[in-house]
Structures are given as C-alpha cells and as structure tokens.
C-alpha cells in the first residue's frame, strides 16, 4: 500500500478537496482499492463522503493501537473507496498523546495501518492545518 499524506499548515488551501478527489479518482478511474484516512479534527473528508460519525475513527485507532483497524473502516458507497473517519475526539486524543511522556506515539498510526496494507493499493491521509500527532505520524 502506498501512502500519501496531504499536509499544509495553512487552513483553506484545498487539502480535503485534494485528498478526497485523489482518493475517488484512484478508485473510480484507475480501479484501485483506496483507504482515505481523515486526520482532520473537523472531519471534513468524512463529511465529504457522508460517513461522519461521533465515535471511533482515527482517534480510536490512535488511543488503542492494538485495535483492529478493520473495525473502524467505513464504506463510502463508492466502489473501491473506504474511509477511517474523524471528528472532534481527535482533538482530545492529540492532547492526551502529546502529554504521555511514557511513550512515543509518532509511529502509532503507521503501525495500525500496516495491518491493512495488503487490503489496499493506496492510503490517502487528509491532515488538518496543524503540526499535531496525526500529521507527525
């Protein structure tokens, strides 16, 4: 699985639109299996594909690295395109992980996504406009 992260520390630059369109084009036109990871607390990519939820998603994956990521993957309704959602829980999770001095969480997301790497051709990560734990992952 090839992973592409869309990052810019400025808001309103088209990160979500770029990530969502790239994911959809890879799935629809190139027939690739794509996992879109919403790494923005606002959950814009999740809303884009109407899979926004109040629970689970990226925050749950980061707070419980042993959790099976397959439990957190939602179908977007588009063939070949799945998503791990995000919401404001990611804000709290980010603060908790930064405060945890006993562990280095920089590779948690990567380790979790490694468990589904054989299920997808691409992973597109939509990051928020911040240098937070999800962006560093």
Predicted regions and their residues:
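P-loop NTP-binding core
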Residues: 1-137
């Amino acid at each position: 699985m090839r992973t592409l992260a869309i990052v810019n520390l400025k808001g309103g630059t088209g990160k979500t639109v770029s990530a969502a369109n790239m994911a959809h084009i890879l799935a629809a036109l190139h027939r690739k299996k794509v996992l879109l990871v919403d790494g923005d607390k606002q959950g814009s990519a999740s809303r884009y594909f109407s899979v926004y939820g109040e629970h689970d998603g990226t925050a749950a994956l980061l707070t419980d690295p042993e959790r099976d990521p397959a439990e957190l993957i939602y179908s977007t309704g588009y063939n070949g395109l799945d998503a791990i959602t995000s919401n404001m829980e990611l804000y709290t999770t980010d603060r908790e992980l930064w405060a945890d001095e006993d562990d280095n969480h920089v590779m948690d997301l990567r380790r979790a996504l490694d468990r589904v790497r054989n299920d997808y051709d691409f992973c597109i990560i939509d990051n928020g406009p911040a240098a937070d734990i999800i962006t560093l992952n």
